[in-house]
Amino acid sequence: MAIIGIGIDVINIFRFKKLIINYGIKIPKKILSKKELIEYSYTHKKEKFLAIRFSIKEAIAKAIGISIFKNNFLNNCEIFYNKKKKIQLTTLGYIKKIFKKSQVKKIFLSVTDSNKHTYAIAILEK
């Protein structure tokens, strides 16, 4: 297997707290898929939830080499945790086509956070 790309991202969580205060639900709607929005509505740490999802999606975009602003990239990546608490990705719409065209077979994702920052890495493999 060959590595297609590696993406890394670091986010300041406080930035998302300010965005939520200033723009309300507009920000989550730009970043999250429909399923993620439902999960978001139940979480207590909304800024951390958004920061984690955004940093993972940004790392994925960097790994594949496209802009997060192209064709609703952020809404077409769905991040969830499986039963073993491992991060998983579901691609939707345009992003699903890009991954197929790029022959992405495996996606390795990792994220960690502190009180101030989230850190994410994505490795895409053929």
UniProtKB/Swiss-Prot annotation:
Query: By its UniProt entry, which InterPro entries does this protein fall under?
Result: 4-PPantetheinyl_Trfase_dom, 4-PPantetheinyl_Trfase_dom_sf, ACPS, Ppantetheine-prot_Trfase_dom
Catalysed reactions, as listed in the record: apo-[ACP] + CoA = holo-[ACP] + adenosine 3',5'-bisphosphate + H(+)
Q: Which Gene3D superfamilies match?
A: 4'-phosphopantetheinyl transferase domain
The alphabetized list of GO BP terms reads: fatty acid biosynthetic process
E.C. no: 2.7.8.7
Q: Write out the GO cellular component annotations.
A: cytoplasm
Report the cofactors: Mg(2+)
Instruction: Report disulfide bridges, numbered on this chain.
Output: none
Q: What is this protein called?
A: Holo-[acyl-carrier-protein] synthase
Q: Which organism is it from?
A: Buchnera aphidicola subsp. Cinara cedri (strain Cc)
